[in-house]
Amino acid sequence: MRSYLVVGNQTLDSPELAEAVRERMATGPATFHIVVPATPVQRGLTWDEDEARAAAQARLADALERFRSSGATVSGEIGHRDPVEATEDALRGRDVDEVLLSTLPPGISRWLGQDVPTRLKGSILVPVTVITALRQSVSTARA
């Protein structure tokens, strides 16, 4: 059975990620583990760690429900605010075949601006596939 680590936050409900998951499920039995980094919820120059964790928890709960409704075997966790550290933490003691990094498009994505895909590829031994959402989540856009 193939195993996938999905790392995402604002894009966990994107059609692009849903399609990538469907494609992997179509190749045979698969399990997914979702990590939602507790990235800061920006309100001007400050942010609140509790608010960041609460937003990440809400996104994780929605994603778990969505994955399960599509027939996926899935688990998940809230991770460190840095997506690279969150990924490395999630990989400790867990074997996966591929990491799916779900991001916003260039110009909007802080993760791409921080070069997260390259940093991940340099720090882990698992293939990393970047899934770029064409839009921001509706729930996030309203926040």
Ranges and model annotations:
Residues 1-47, 126, 130-133:
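Small/aliphatic-rich secondary-structure junction motif
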Residues 16-17, 43-48, 88-89, 111-112, ...:
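Short, well-ordered secondary-structure micro-motifs
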Residues 34-58, 140-143:
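Acidic, proline/glycine-rich short linear motifs
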Residues 53-61, 114-117:
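Short, surface-exposed alpha-helical segments at coil->helix boundaries
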Residues 70-98, 143:
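Structural beta-alpha unit
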Residues 102-119:
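Glycine-rich, Arg-bearing micro-motifs that act as flexible, cationic patches
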Residues 122-123, 127-131, 139-143:
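Glycine-rich, aromatic-bearing surface loops/beta-hairpins
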